[in-house]
C-alpha cells in the first residue's frame, strides 16, 4: 500500500472510532444536560426572535476594526527593507494614530459603557 492510502485508511478508521465513542459515552449515564443540544448558552426551544442588544454589535465592529489594524501593521517589520522605510513608518503611524483617535472619540462619547 502506498503512503496516501495508508493515511486515508488511518484517518477514516480513527474518525469512525471517535464518532462511535462520542455516541456511546452519553448513553452510559443519561442526563437531561447530556441529552439536550447546546446552542451557545441560548435555549434551543425558545424563540429565535429575542431582542438583541446593540452594544454587542458595537463591540464586534470595534473588534473588527482593531483586528484589521493588527493585520495592516503585521508586515511593518519588513517595511524597513523597502526603498523608503521612513515613508512606511509615517503611514503606519498615521493609521495607528487615526484608529487611536477613533477609539478615544468612541470612549468619550460613551460607546464603550455597558448600559442596561
Curated annotation (Swiss-Prot):
Its EC number is 7.1.1.2. Pfam families: Oxidored_q4 (PF00507). One of its GO terms (cellular component) is NADH dehydrogenase complex. Signal peptide: none annotated. Keywords: Electron transport, Membrane, Mitochondrion, NAD, Respiratory chain, Translocase, Transmembrane, Transmembrane helix, Transport, Ubiquinone. It is an enzyme of class 7 (translocase). Gene3D superfamilies: NADH:ubiquinone/plastoquinone oxidoreductase, chain 3 (1.20.58.1610). The keyword Electron transport applies. Its main location: mitochondrion. It is a multi-pass membrane protein. It is found in: Mitochondrion membrane. Coiled coil: none annotated. It catalyses: a ubiquinone + NADH + 5 H(+)(in) = a ubiquinol + NAD(+) + 4 H(+)(out). It comes from the Eukaryota. GO terms for molecular function: NADH dehydrogenase (ubiquinone) activity. Core subunit of the mitochondrial membrane respiratory chain NADH dehydrogenase (Complex I) that is believed to belong to the minimal assembly required for catalysis. Complex I functions in the transfer of electrons from NADH to the respiratory chain. The immediate electron acceptor for the enzyme is believed to be ubiquinone. Belongs to the complex I subunit 3 family. This is NADH-ubiquinone oxidoreductase chain 3. It comes from Oncorhynchus mykiss (Rainbow trout). The gene is MT-ND3.
Amino acid at each position: 500500500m502506498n503512503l496516501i492510502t495508508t493515511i486515508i485508511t488511518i484517518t477514516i478508521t480513527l474518525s469512525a472510532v471517535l464518532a462511535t465513542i462520542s455516541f456511546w459515552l452519553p448513553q452510559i449515564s443519561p442526563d437531561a444536560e447530556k441529552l439536550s443540544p447546546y446552542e451557545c448558552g441560548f435555549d434551543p426551544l425558545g424563540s429565535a426572535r429575542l431582542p438583541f442588544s446593540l452594544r454587542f454589535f458595537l463591540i464586534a465592529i470595534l473588534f473588527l476594526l482593531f483586528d484589521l489594524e493588527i493585520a495592516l501593521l503585521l508586515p511593518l517589520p519588513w517595511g524597513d527593507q523597502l526603498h523608503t522605510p521612513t515613508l512606511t513608518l509615517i503611514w503606519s503611524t498615521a493609521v495607528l494614530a487615526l484608529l487611536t483617535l477613533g477609539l478615544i472619540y468612541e470612549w468619550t462619547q460613551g460607546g464603550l459603557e455597558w448600559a442596561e
